[in-house]
From Swiss-Prot:
PANTHER family: G PROTEIN-COUPLED RECEPTOR KINASE 5, G PROTEIN-COUPLED RECEPTOR KINASE/RIBOSOMAL PROTEIN S6 KINASE. This is G protein-coupled receptor kinase 5. Residues 53-171 form the RGS domain. It holds the Pfam family RGS. GO terms for molecular function: ATP binding; G protein-coupled receptor kinase activity; lipid binding; protein kinase activity; protein serine/threonine kinase activity. Inhibited by calmodulin with an IC(50) of 50 nM. Calmodulin inhibits GRK5 association with receptor and phospholipid. Residues 546-565 are annotated as: Sufficient for membrane localization. The active site is at 311 (proton acceptor). GO terms for biological process: apoptotic process; negative regulation of apoptotic process; protein autophosphorylation; regulation of signal transduction; Wnt signaling pathway. Autophosphorylated. Autophosphorylation may play a critical role in the regulation of GRK5 kinase activity. It catalyses: [G-protein-coupled receptor] + ATP = [G-protein-coupled receptor]-phosphate + ADP + H(+).
Length: 590
């Protein structure tokens, strides 16, 4: 039994390391899998794609790179891209160097005598920016100038881009992105844990070698528990949120027995494991502060979409290979209608906010209470209203949440104690973060005085702890309890509508990011020599016919031999070819 676990872990670790070869986990046929269609095959896509500048040229990673490549071939536009890059660097510059970096940008791009002067930013706006720089430089100094540049680029340059070979290449990438996703898209590895409707296992995309976690939701288990709306809600929320601090959904597909969510893999274990199983319970304040800041950024991204998470607790915060965290398991998250409040007594005992326990209407406030619980537990080594391994009834824990004050030990600095008390204020209207400014108000608390959130959000700060790359931070394979077989539930065609809403294939932004991170984009995104069209982009150059398989070539040779002696062999030959074609397709999709 121990051998089975060792083998499963060894295979997983080898996959995480890229298989040890030059392909870094990619299939031998990865270029064939990601072969561009001929541009003539993309005409339907060209007609139907939403031609929105922000989506095509900024939000979508592959689109952003291709628009940049287009601009770099136009002498008048190259400086605009360089300006945007310089501002992005400015925004993550340490505070003490902002003035120096700001002056550099002003001189290079916003001074008329400069060879790369940005002509489309108005003189009044330049003067206002210069005045703010002299008074006190801030991260948002060039925001209005950036908006002005984008306003210009979304005009004539964008329309020229839509007629260029770079947009044609984007259509080819979109065509690949929209290809069907099945279980054969992935290699499957060991079980990592279990969710409410099925197991979670590690998997790897054959074409790119990228590792993910596959959350399997068993169809019969969903139907038996009437969990369709909950499963679809989680999928749609994951699809909507693109944050480096929340697990991302990359693919959604179905098999005969399950619906599958393919998510960011987090190999470093959860916060509960690290709080209680790595030496003395709890963290040094510096480490707790770093995780709290990243959790706060994740909440901010969710709240930006008007989504309240409602289940903050250590086991739902996962670490990646580098020690950064992400919020996971969005099963209880819900989107709040604009200008409305919701009601729902959901969450985990000891972490639910007073307004949730009292079944009152609320907005985003429960998440700031949950953040307070997490900061307290990371520092103290136990949750604020329940001792470690304390056996106590749910009603008693709820009473403590509603009526008692948390106790602070010597482990808390004054700033840490202050932020916890302000986040654990029982009246939601008085709670830190629950005013109009939301997360921005929490970021200004003295606890985060030395945290550069711009650099944190850009992934430029080193975590205080890095997980061991040779360790598998999950239970042994045989210790993960298996689900029992679901009996008395039959699947039929009435379930198909739900399955079709769920199984939508690749999610654009994560899929495109995967192509870039695994260097597939760099290797495949090749044009003709000296900026000319590659054959697959040449409309007058017909696409190559598909290569015939061995059986087809043999049948053709047989037909040629038979045709010399039999005038009626044509029908027989067509029958052979059609039979072989069906057989070949069946094999390819298995």
């Amino acid at each position: 039994m121990e051998l089975e676990n060792i083998v499963a872990n060894t295979v997983l670790l080898k996959a995480r390391e890229g298989g040890g070869g030059k392909r870094k986990g990619k299939s031998k046929k990865w270029k064939e899998i990601l072969k561009f269609p001929h541009i003539n095959q993309c005409e339907d896509l060209r007609r139907t794609i939403d031609r929105d500048y922000c989506s095509l040229c900024d939000k979508q990673p592959v689109g952003r790179l291709l628009f940049r490549q287009f601009c770099e071939t136009r002498p008048g536009l190259e400086s605009y891209i360089q300006f945007l890059d310089s501002v992005a660097e400015y925004e993550v510059t340490p505070d003490e160097k902002l003035g120096e970096k700001g002056k550099e940008i002003m001189t290079k791009y916003l001074t008329p005598k400069s060879p790369v002067f940005i002509t489309q930013v108005g003189r009044d706006l330049v003067s206002q920016t210069e005045e703010k720089l002299l008074q006190k430089p801030c991260k948002e100094l060039f925001s209005a100038c950036v908006q002005s540049v984008h306003d210009y680029l979304r005009g004539e340059p964008f329309h020229e881009y839509l007629d260029s070979m770079y947009f044609d290449r984007f259509l080819q990438w979109k065509w690949l992105e929209r290809q069907p996703v099945t279980k054969n898209t992935f290699r499957q590895y060991r079980v990592l844990g279990k969710g409410g409707f099925g197991e979670v296992c590690a998997c790897q995309v054959r074409a790119t070698g990228k590792m993910y976690a596959c959350k399997r939701l068993e169809k019969k288990r969903i139907k038996k528990r009437k969990g369709e709306s909950m499963a679809l809600n989680e999928k749609q929320i994951l699809e909507k949120v693109n944050s480096r601090f929340v697990v991302n959904l990359a693919y959604a597909y179905e098999t005969k027995d399950a619906l599958c969510l393919v998510l960011t893999i987090m190999n470093g274990g959860d916060l509960k494991f690290h709080i209680y199983n790595m030496g003395n319970p709890g963290f040094e304040e510096e480490r707790a502060l770093f995780y709290a800041a990243e959790i706060l950024c994740g909440l901010e991204d969710l709240h930006h979409e008007n989504i309240v998470y409602r289940d903050l607790k250590p086991e739902n915060i996962l670490l990646d290979d580098y020690g950064h965290i992400r919020i996971s398991d969005l099963g209880l998250a819900v989107k709040i209608p604009e200008g409305d409040l919701i009601r729902g007594r959901v969450g985990t005992v000891g972490y639910m906010a007073p307004e949730v326990l009292n079944n009152q209407r609320y907005g985003l406030s429960p998440d700031y209470w949950g953040l307070g619980c997490l900061i307290y537990e990371m520092i103290e080594g136990q949750s604020p209203f329940r001792g470690r391994k304390e056996k106590v009834k749910r009603e008693e824990v709820d009473r403590r949440v509603l009526e008692t004050e948390e106790v602070y030990s010597h482990k808390f600095s004054e700033e840490a104690k202050s932020i916890c008390k302000m986040l654990l204020t029982k009246d939601a209207k008085q709670r830190l973060g629950c005013q109009e400014e939301g997360a921005a108000e929490v970021k200004r608390h003295p606890f985060f005085r030395n945290m550069n959130f711009k650099r944190l959000e850009a992934g430029m700060l080193d975590p205080p702890f890095v997980p061991d790359p040779r360790a598998v931070y999950c239970k042994d394979v045989l210790d993960i309890e298996q689900f029992s077989t679901v009996k008395g539930v039959n699947l039929d065609h009435t379930d198909d509508d739900f399955y079709s809403k769920f199984s939508t294939g690749s999610v654009p932004i994560p899929w495109q990011s995967e192509m870039i991170e695994t260097e597939c984009f760099k290797e495949l995104n090749v044009f003709g020599p000296h900026g000319t069209l590659s054959p697959d982009l040449n409309r007058s150059h017909p696409p190559e016919p598909p290569k015939k398989g061995l059986l087809q070539r043999l049948f053709k040779r047989q037909h040629q031999n038979n045709s010399k002696s039999s005038p009626n062999s044509k029908t027989s030959f067509n029958h052979h070819i059609n039979s072989n074609h069906v057989s070949s397709n069946s094999t390819g999709s298995s």
